């Protein structure tokens, strides 16, 4: 009865293969997170700023602060 021969393990290119896999995975994940941030945070914030400044009246705000006595130089 002959002993069973085990196949030799691959010893070359292990680091390169792992680095390639992890670099691709990291790149794909970073693009996904960036896209989710843009859709979930940046676009909503941009819309909120646009809505605020569409209806913002600086003179009305200034007059309210002047009447409240916030400014010392404006009476």
From Swiss-Prot:
It holds the Pfam family COX6C. InterPro entries: Cytochrome_c_oxidase_VIc, Cytochrome_c_oxidase_VIc/VIIs, Cytochrome_c_oxidase_VIc_sf. One of its GO terms (cellular component) is mitochondrial inner membrane. It comes from the Eukaryota. Residues 1-13 are mitochondrial matrix. It is found in: Mitochondrion inner membrane. Disulfide bonds: none annotated. The keyword Transmembrane helix applies. Pathway: Energy metabolism; oxidative phosphorylation. The chain crosses the membrane at residues 14-54. Residues 55-75 are mitochondrial intermembrane. It is a single-pass membrane protein. Signal peptide: none annotated. Keywords: Membrane, Mitochondrion, Mitochondrion inner membrane, Transmembrane, Transmembrane helix. One of its GO terms (biological process) is oxidative phosphorylation. Component of the cytochrome c oxidase, the last enzyme in the mitochondrial electron transport chain which drives oxidative phosphorylation. The respiratory chain contains 3 multisubunit complexes succinate dehydrogenase (complex II, CII), ubiquinol-cytochrome c oxidoreductase (cytochrome b-c1 complex, complex III, CIII) and cytochrome c oxidase (complex IV, CIV), that cooperate to transfer electrons derived from NADH and succinate to molecular oxygen, creating an electrochemical gradient over the inner membrane that drives transmembrane transport and the ATP synthase. Component of the cytochrome c oxidase (complex IV, CIV), a multisubunit enzyme composed of 14 subunits. The complex is composed of a catalytic core of 3 subunits MT-CO1, MT-CO2 and MT-CO3, encoded in the mitochondrial DNA, and 11 supernumerary subunits COX4I, COX5A, COX5B, COX6A, COX6B, COX6C, COX7A, COX7B, COX7C, COX8 and NDUFA4, which are encoded in the nuclear genome. Belongs to the cytochrome c oxidase subunit 6c family. This is Cytochrome c oxidase subunit 6C. It comes from Macaca silenus (Lion-tailed macaque). The gene is COX6C.
